[in-house]
Design a protein with these regions (language model features):
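Active-site helix/loop of acyl-thioester processing domains in fatty-acid/polyketide metabolism
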Residues: 51-74
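N-terminal structural module
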Residues: 7-21, 25-29
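A generic structural signal for short beta-strands and their flanking turns/coil linkers
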Residues: 20, 30-32, 78-84, 95, ...
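Hydrophobic beta-strand-centered segment that forms part of the acyl-chain substrate-binding groove
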Residues: 67-98, 103
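Short beta-strand segments enriched in hydrophobic/aromatic residues
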Residues: 38, 72, 134-136
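Catalytic strand-loop segment that frames the active site of acyl-thioester-processing enzymes
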Residues: 23-50
């Protein structure tokens, strides 16, 4: 998929992403880097002021799906999550969260990705890692 079209879908056309402020930082074929800026509504643990785990898993899933989509030539293809595992390694702090995803395998109907999430201030310290499997549907009559 064209990187500019994928960026528009992720940032503007998916209401949930738009609500959270998801930004596509880098899009290459089979590899994406996206981020969500911190805001107080994203806190899930008020005692530690840690980011909600749902925000972390959402960003992992969005990055993984985008990595699959970025490798597809058919712009009308649909990508949906079949299975996803997220390992939470440390609390997310009150700052921008970044997710990098890379395509591990792309088949006709399935895509597999690895994801890594971190803060820009400490890129070597993973907040979470993940692996996901996505279903790919190419509409009838498409290439």
């Amino acid at each position: 998929m064209d990187p500019d079209a994928l960026r528009q879908v992720m940032e503007e056309l998916i209401p949930f992403n738009k609500f959270l402020g998801v930004r596509a930082v880098e899009i290459d074929r089979g590899r994406v880097r996206i981020e969500v800026p911190f805001r107080p509504e994203l806190i899930g643990d008020p005692l530690r002021q840690a980011m909600h785990g749902g925000v972390i898993s959402m960003l992992a899933d969005t990055a993984g799906g985008a990595a699959v989509w970025s490798a597809l030539d058919e712009p009308r293809a649909r990508v949906s999550t079949i299975d996803m595992r997220v390992d939470y390694l440390r609390p997310g702090r009150q700052e921008t969260l970044v997710a990098e995803a890379s395509l591990v395998r792309l088949g006709r109907r399935l895509g597999v990705t690895d994801m890594r999430l971190f803060h820009p201030s400490a890129p070597g310290d993973a907040i979470a890692t993940g692996k996901a499997v996505y279903n790919i549907v190419i509409p009838r009559g498409a290439a």
